[in-house]
Amino acid sequence: MSTILIAIIALAVLAAVFGAILGFASIRFKVEADPIVDQIDTILPQTQCGQCGYPGCRPYAEAIANGDKINKCPPGGQATIEKLADLMGVEVEDSAHDLDNKVKTVAFIHEDMCIGCTKCIQACPVDAIVGGTKALHTVIKDECTGCDLCVAPCPTDCIEMIPVATTTENWKWQMNIIPVTDITNQATDATASEPKA
């Protein structure tokens, strides 16, 4: 047998042995995660913005499971707080960030000042900034959560947080407080109670 063939067979045997050991170890030493943390993490918006004081949504979910407040997520808003309260069996709290009076903002890059350093792209947790090295960067307004994390790393201070104008598309419609009457049952009840001729 040639030396190359022996080396290939030896490497294949070693790979199979180590693969079997790793497969056994992953099953034997598996760490079971808390299912409530997974449920909380599913409810959170996954923006990884850090506005809650934690480095991402998963650490915040773990903190909630350990008793932290459920009202620290600005991108999730009041709807997320209500879902978390329902899941955790606690009272619905008002947001810790005063979301009702806060104007939604998005990042705006003054492209005439941008040097294309990509520091803002690296800081953005939701990939709302596009551009390349030594190229102008721009913000995708619909993707930006307004977390403000891109402003500090910018060496030329060309990023500004600007308020989003309220339109019919982004206005906070409160559908759950508008009284809606189901008239389908009333119509069938009325026709059933009419005397037949």
Swiss-Prot record:
UniProt: [4Fe-4S] cluster 1 binding residues: C49, C52, C57, C73
Q: Which InterPro entries match?
A: 4Fe-4S_dom, 4Fe4S_Fe-S-bd, 4Fe4S_Fe_S_CS, Elect_transpt_cplx_RnfB/RsxB, RnfB/RsxB_Proteobac, RnfB_subfamily
Query: Cofactor note, please?
Result: Binds 3 [4Fe-4S] clusters.
Q: Where is the 4Fe-4S ferredoxin-type domain?
A: 105-134, 135-164
Q: Which residues form the 4Fe-4S domain?
A: 32-90
Please state where this protein is localized: Cell inner membrane
Sites binding [4Fe-4S] cluster 2 sit at C114, C117, C120, C154
Quick one: where is this thing mainly located?
membrane
Coiled coil segments of this chain: none
Read off the Pfam families from this record.
Fer4_21, FeS
Q: Which residues bind [4Fe-4S] cluster 3?
A: C124, C144, C147, C150
- For the protein in the UniProt heading, the enzyme class is translocase
Please name the GO terms of the biological process aspect recorded for this protein, alphabetically: electron transport chain
Annotated GO CC locations: plasma membrane
Family annotation (Gene3D superfamilies)? 3.30.70.20, Electron transport complex subunit B, putative Fe-S cluster (1.10.15.40)
Q: How does it assemble?
A: The complex is composed of six subunits: RnfA, RnfB, RnfC, RnfD, RnfE and RnfG.
Please name the HAMAP family in this protein's record. RsxB_RnfB
Family membership, please give it: Belongs to the 4Fe4S bacterial-type ferredoxin family. RnfB subfamily.
This molecule's function is given as: Part of a membrane-bound complex that couples electron transfer with translocation of ions across the membrane.
Q: What's the name of the protein?
A: Ion-translocating oxidoreductase complex subunit B
**What is the organism of origin for this protein?**
Vibrio atlanticus (strain LGP32) (Vibrio splendidus (strain Mel32))
Q: Which gene encodes it?
A: rnfB
